């Protein structure tokens, strides 16, 4: 950090911001007229906000979106969701990929999922074919070949997960509804 204050004001954001790994860009979600985050923009530090690039727009009014980073700091994830359905897009740190995020899995009514990246794999937390959720994974270069890593367990809700050096930490709730 060079301890400089950035005075580039960006209005009408949701407060959801993500710095690029190279510190050249700032990704943010912009609010629509109903005060819902529906668009993701890329702002290049040191440029005028009016030149920011729209990189994602959620067209379905039921859904809102946000952006975040992966645990291994190799990918960015745009998550869009409503109460029971979600969808994720991703891109890497290549500036050309910012403008065309890749769809991970097409949304399916009633299916929720989130994605992270660690150790050469995408890790998926989902309720697809798993009422109480499961954790699946696939290699970065083969997102069509997803396999269960921690399958659904009867009466155990598999919650979120995070990664530490060589460990995955997950939460589970017994006798979950």
Predicted stretch roles:
Residues 1-177:
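Peripheral, non-catalytic segments that deliver or gate enzyme domains
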